[in-house]
A protein has these predicted regions:
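Glycine-rich phosphate/diphosphate-binding loops and the adjacent beta-loop-alpha structural elements
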Residues: 245-322
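N-terminal amphipathic/basic leader segments beginning at the initiator methionine
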Residues: 36-91, 364-366, 370-383
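Glycine-rich oxoanion-binding loops at beta->alpha junctions
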Residues: 99, 106-138, 287
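C-terminal non-catalytic interaction/assembly regions of soluble proteins
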Residues: 285, 294-383
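Internal, active-site/partner-interface "lid" segment
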Residues: 182-191, 201-264
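Short glycine-rich or small-residue beta-strand-to-loop segments that form or flank ligand, phosphate
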Residues: 44, 89-96, 112-115, 141-151, ...
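Intrinsically disordered, low-complexity segments enriched in small polar residues
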Residues: 5, 10-11
Length: 383
């Protein structure tokens, strides 16, 4: 299967259960000609065929990063091209496609060893997770980082059970659940896992890179999740290629506060306000929760927050920086130090216009792990 100069894995893990959703059907080659199968009247997208969007995107990712990534186009798994030696805890994550660079863009030194890509806004199947877990194990166990969506949690849990029964690989799991907009939704039991997932993958990945044991890496990941909260908003909805129309209707002049990353509408709708007021809508509920958190379980003192202003996919960087400026001002007024920050697209929702804010209370250890070298398509520093 030709993919530029990138090495492509192939083959599947044999199915050992009767769940028909466990095994991914074979994926055809991308067409080079022929009709574009989509609703031309309702959406415009740079795609070939709706059915092949994820495979085509992974093929392009392999061509763009031939020296960093090793991509299995059959299983839709992104692997770190040069894994560390035996004895390193491996970390995998995954979820529906459409949130790029999450998760595949965070595979590499200092973050993930593998990422499982589901179809757009659809959880990866257990067989993908089993294959990735078995492939990346270096004898020290594997950490699964899972966003709190029912399908993701169920399929990763099933995969861990299969791995335990078939190979005995030690697996730990951390479920992210940082979205303050909802306590429950159609997709979750409890809060949704959103922006803090990026922080968990970065900080836990640094701990694993240092050679720390599985229980310690998992404990650090859980600490980051517990210390983080997020809130998002949208100016427009997003369009899933297979649907051909926006996931919800948002009239001109209105915005949604508290949206999800799968095109879920927000918890309330209101007239579009100036950026300063929108920033306040995001900061206020997050700070209400962060100030209620107990002191972090670490030897260091609270060092402030790591702040991420994240674009939802169609928001210009100019506007994201403008929003960060307003948010930084509000945090300063509240007496909160921004120790580190990210501004850009890190966990998106296809072509949605809008942004989200994630704040993580950090201590000296978490900041040190945050600052550790990372070399992935989506995050790079110090490497």
């Amino acid at each position: 299967m030709p993919v530029a100069s990138a090495r492509i894995r192939s083959g599947k893990v044999a199915a050992t259960c009767t769940d028909v959703h466990r095994v991914r059907p074979s994926v055809p080659e991308a067409p080079h000609s022929g009709p574009w199968r989509g609703s031309v009247s309702t959406m415009k997208k740079l795609i070939n065929a709706v059915d092949n969007v994820v495979t085509d995107a992974l093929r392009g990712m392999a061509a763009a990063h031939p020296h960093e990534l090793d991509i299995d186009l059959d299983q839709h798994i992104v692997y770190r091209r040069r894994p560390k030696e035996q004895g390193k805890v491996a970390i995998i994550s995954g979820g529906g496609s459409g949130h790029e660079p999450l998760h595949g863009g965070f595979v590499g030194t200092g973050m993930l060893d593998a990422a499982c890509a589901g179809e757009i806004f659809t959880s990866p199947v257990p067989d993908q997770v089993v294959a990735a877990t078995s492939a990346v194990d270096r004898g020290a166990g594997v950490l699964h980082i899972v966003k709190n969506y029912t399908g993701d949690v169920m399929n990763f849990e099933m995969a861990a059970e299969i791995v335990d029964a078939e190979s005995g690989i030690q697996v730990a799991s951390v479920v992210t659940n940082d979205d303050v907009a909802v306590e429950d939704s159609l997709f979750t039991a409890g809060r949704r896992g959103v922006g803090v997932t990026v922080m968990v993958e970065k900080i836990a990945g640094a701990a694993a890179e240092q050679g720390r044991p599985l229980d310690e890496v998992a404990g650090i990941a859980a600490r980051v999740n517990a210390a983080g909260r997020s809130m998002g908003m949208a100016l427009t909805s997003c369009t899933v290629p297979a649907n051909g129309k926006p996931s919800f209707d948002l009239p001109e002049g209105e915005m949604e506060i508290g949206i999800g990353i799968h095109g879920e509408p927000g918890r309330h709708r209101e007239k579009i306000a100036p950026a300063a007021e929108i920033a306040e809508r995001l900061v206020t509920p997050i700070l209400a929760e962060l100030t209620a958190l107990t002191e972090l379980d670490s030897a260091g003192a609270d060092e402030g927050v790591i702040a991420m202003v994240n674009g939802m996919g169609a928001t210009p960087l100019l506007e994201l920086y403008l929003m960060y400026g307003e948010i930084a001002r509000l945090l300063q007024d509240a007496g909160i130090t921004v120790a580190r920050n990210l501004v850009g697209n890190y966990i998106t929702s296809l072509d949605m216009a809008g942004c989200s804010l994630t704040l993580v209370r950090a201590d000296a250890e978490l900041l040190s792990l945050w600052d550790a070298p990372v070399n992935t398509p989506g995050l790079r520093w110090g490497a």
